[in-house]
Amino acid sequence: MTADRQWVKIIARWLARIDGISGMLRLAMLGLTGVSTMSFTLKDYGLERLVWPLIGAMCVGTLLFAYYYTEGGVWNQVHRDKRDMSQNYATPFQKISNEMTARGLYAGEKGSELSQEERQAIQKEIDMAYMELRDGIEVEKDD
């Protein structure tokens, strides 16, 4: 069910943005540790007037980062690249599955069992394709 109230839509959108950068939030926590250390250092040097502007700048920077990371297309591109890297190669399971599919389809078209020569030809062709694709293919980038 889609929300009808505007404030629900706004909150849901921001929660989706935050969820989109949840991996980056760990980096933000490290930044917060850095700000804490820097605020103590600034206080020790008598520059505590710079602490609140520093914290404010970090908060604004985090919101801007969340917005541009999700709405600017970075999040989508990261997920596309991850998908390309994780699915861009042939696995032994795919080799076995493809060989079984090829045998089944060819036997079905033929209407009878395959001969040993036909099985070897299918296996040889799939082995060649597997060797070509097991390390992945080069995915073209839109530049």
Swiss-Prot record:
The chain crosses the membrane at residues 20-42, 52-74. The keyword Signal does not apply. It is a multi-pass membrane protein. Disulfide bonds: none annotated. GO terms for cellular component: host cell membrane; membrane. It comes from the Viruses. It is found in: Host membrane. This is Putative transmembrane protein ORF32. Keywords: Host membrane, Membrane, Transmembrane, Transmembrane helix.
